[in-house]
Amino acid sequence: EIEKITRRFAQELIKRDLISPSMNVPAPDIGTSSTEMAWIADEYRKINPVDINGAACVTGKPANKNGLVGREEATGRGVQFIVREFFRNPELLKLVKLDDDLSSKSFILQGFGNVGYHLSKFLTEDDKVKLIGLAEYNGGIYNEDGINVEHAKKYFIKNKSFENYPKASFVKDSSLLLKRQCDILIPAARENVITEKNAADISAKLIVEAANGPISYKGNQILNKNRIFVIPDILANSGGVAVSYFEWVKNIRH
């Protein structure tokens, strides 16, 4: 059903010239993956068989279907790079009253999809940052001693929930995890999760917007007043868009 809906939607977009290699090039987001992107590209080729740049009508395709190796994890990798650069900047660290030892820091993550999974994997394995809280739509887990990303991922895929997870405390209302004490809070799910209703309760010193628009305007005003530093989404999660551009260039240059 998903394939039928995706292909039909793509057909209607293409027939109306709403997507093409030179205009409105889609990429994966919540609920989609490289599979859906491949279906869209396939429909474009069927409707425009003589367009030699047809593969560039969409990015985030599988590597074996004119995609780019590394695109899947690019957004999470980009957030990791931004966090690293922040901790290399003495002036910014002074503002949030943190030292430059990233490996001694803790973080809480909201969202365990493509971006959240890869980001938490990179931060914990490469930079030794401790993941102490993990929030999903149907509950979260907390362990101040750290959470193993791969173990948590396997459990969530199998059970579709963190309930009864053996190596951390289950938190039914995962939004409460946003208020827990940590050095870095990373919302990587949906928009408007930090608003005027809960911004005053945020205790993290640094917030990194891995999701698009996770902080509302009024919520941001409260965070500014409380001197909580926010790395905005337009910078923090730009890794995916950057690598999508590389894929697009690869396609139009053949």
Walk through the language-model features, giving the residues of each.
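Short glycine-/small-residue-rich Rossmann-like dinucleotide-binding loops
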Residues: 186-190, 211-212
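Rossmann-fold NAD(P) dinucleotide-binding segment
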Residues: 172-182, 190-207
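Glycine/serine-rich phosphate-binding loop and adjoining beta1-alpha1 elements at the start
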Residues: 1-103
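Adenosine-phosphate binding glycine-rich loop
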Residues: 86, 201, 205-254
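Conserved active-site and cofactor/substrate-binding residues in soluble primary-metabolism enzymes
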Residues: 4, 8, 31-35, 39, ...
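Structural motif
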Residues: 108, 184-186, 208
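Structural signal for hydrophobic packing residues in well-ordered secondary-structure cores
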Residues: 3-21, 41-52, 83-91, 114, ...
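Glycine-rich phosphate/diphosphate-binding loop of Rossmann-like nucleotide-binding domains
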Residues: 62, 66-179
